Amino acid sequence: MTISTLLLSPNRRLLTCLSRVPSPWLLHSSHPAPGPPGALPNCFGHHCTKRVLLSDGFRRTLCVQATLKDHTEGLSDKEQRFVDRLYTGLVKGQRACLAEAITLVESTHTRKRELAQVLLQRVLALQREQELRNQGKPLTFRVGLSGPPGAGKSTFIECFGKMLTEQGHRLSVLAVDPSSCTSGGSLLGDKTRMIELSRDMNAYIRPSPTSGTLGGVTRTTNEAIVLCEGGGYDIILIETVGVGQSEFAVADMVDMFVLLLPPAGGDELQGIKRGIIEMADLVVITKSDGDLIVPARRIQAEYVSALKLLRRRSEVWRPKVIRISARSGEGITEMWDTMREFQHQMLASGELAAKRQTQHKVWMWNLIQENVLEHFKTHPSIREQIPLMERKVLSGALSPGRAADLLLKAFKSRH
């Protein structure tokens, strides 16, 4: 009797007996999932083949395997070896492979982006298997950090990150660095402001230029998060430039959104958009030391009162306001305890898992919008008309809305 026949058998006692058979026998007797040469024991193919006999979810597992096969069929031998090398090195925790993989997903070259999607599909499949073994709960914690310039984000991350690595965590910091709209250049200076943390072998800091994207969050931030998690980093910090739309973009990528604010004078609440405060799961008043302790306490009280008037986004969590000092270390431990409390409550209620699923849909639609716009602009029939339409809009001959309608009609007529 073949394995496929046994899978269709209604005799669950027989399947239970088979589940006790050592994994190597299963791999030899059944059709193993495609996997990289020399893959690790915990690689995707090994677990999926065993899961076929262990649960009723084998149809979904086989579907994922078929998807992986579809992705790899068009690869040359050289490309397959390249993806295999990156994947194997990534799951082994090799920092060089992680850096190379992030560089691959950041590439604008069409073929390299296709290879990046193959790699991401394999990492996501492994991540899904690990979550299934953890009762469907995420194994990592994603935190978005934002705040106005001068709030002390980099100083805080270094102090906070060192505390986490000393506790045995592996930390990845994705620091989105603003690019020049004129030259496209970027300083990428976050590592120079986190000297001690950048030397820590349990921390990985990756500055990423925005390349002029709106809001300061790169197109590939989601992909970089997944790759860092595949590389064994259990805490991911995403630091944004804090210039408006970046906060809304990063909120669709993280489990917890933390807003860092300095103790300043004047109308503080008027300077922060209401929507940004509503998104915050935790408001942190930084630089609460020395002469700034009194202003920090006043700002804390103002935000506590303000948050009471806002609609809660979670049924189990009410946003809190705390004070910290990265210079003295005061409040850093309490802040981490608050963040862990948030994570535990969201996991227990199931809100965190639901949030991750929603974020995957947002991720997909964001990519669709970006790719459709790129395809529209580069379409031969549209590319020739764009300069003409722009001149007519500037001269007042056409309204922007009318020009857009004409371009869209021309685009539809060619399809």
Curated annotation (Swiss-Prot):
Swiss-Prot/TrEMBL GO biological process terms: cobalamin metabolic process
- What residue stretch is labeled transit peptide in the record? 1-62
Q: What SMART domains does the record tag this protein with?
A: AAA
Keywords carried by this UniProt record: Chaperone, Cytoplasm, GTP-binding, Hydrolase, Mitochondrion, Nucleotide-binding, Transit peptide
**Keyword rRNA-binding in annotation:** no
Q: What class of enzyme is it?
A: hydrolase
Q: Which SUPFAM superfamilies match?
A: P-loop containing nucleoside triphosphate hydrolases (SSF52540)
* Record-given protein name: Methylmalonic aciduria type A homolog, mitochondrial
